[in-house]
Amino acid sequence: MKKLVVNKKYNNKKLDKFLKDNISTLSNNLFYKTLRKKDIKINGKRVSENVTVFENDEILVYIPDNLLENKLNLDIIYEDNNILLINKPSNIEVTGQDSLTEVVHKLYSSCEFKPMPCHRLDRNTSGLILFAKNTQALEILLNKFKHHEIEKHYLALVYGIPQKKNERLISYLFKDSSKSLVYISDVPKKGYQKIITSYSLIESFDNNTSLLDVEIETGRTHQIRAHLAHIGLPIIGDGKYGINEFNKKFKAKTQKLISYKLIFKFESDSKILEYLSKKSFELKSGKKLLF
């Protein structure tokens, strides 16, 4: 149970705003579930709606402590006044409800500008994700990603041995939102968007698997997973584009794909972020996490 008293800052604010700002691990789902069960009291009276609260209101929230434990400890790789670099675990979205961004916003709730993500990772892809900590940094970084002045590198453990040690792949991708799937074509088609994926072979193994460094110049949904599967190199552990037989063989419970390196190759004016030019950040534990 949590006991809270509304301060002047939250006078005439909604209940969810007050509670989520003051209970950092309270998600939208948990808030509304608790509300439906009438497990919230304001000044001794149970409430079932997202009511307005006022200064000095006493609020009791009847939620078991284990449900309020912080389920996601942020693994911060680097932070300064402008950027925040986090190692995202798998099985969490970057944005949306109960997402990494939501957790970041709760932890930085006292900041005037809450850190915002500058690029995306699929839900089941772990690794480096870059947040901007102010408006100017966000504008600069979004522009740098758009113009490919920041390289995004991934480690992928795939089934198969590539015919070439290095290759730049150009194909076309169609996203079927109704099925949550994408399709790849080698030739342009109506509704398909151009994708560019490059890989370099790091190492191949006796069990017919390979470790690849993968770089993407475009950032489409499921791009790496679908593109590699399209050329006969499915990512191990990928339940959507991989091969279940091999996933079971290698006892892979999660897909073997990690965002492990960001390289800043600024070619145009980067203003307050000039100090990042020619820098790189690498997740040293990336390779170990795949095996």
Give residue ranges: language-model regions.
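RNA pseudouridine synthases
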Residues: M1-K179, F205
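Pseudouridine synthases involved in rRNA/tRNA modification
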Residues: M1-N29, K33, K189-K190, I202, ...
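Short, well-ordered beta-strand micro-motif
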Residues: L60-Y62, D213, I263
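Short, well-ordered beta-strand segments enriched in hydrophobic/aromatic residues
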Residues: L84, S210-E215
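Short, solvent-exposed loop/beta-turn-alpha elements that line the ligand-binding surface or hinge
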Residues: I184
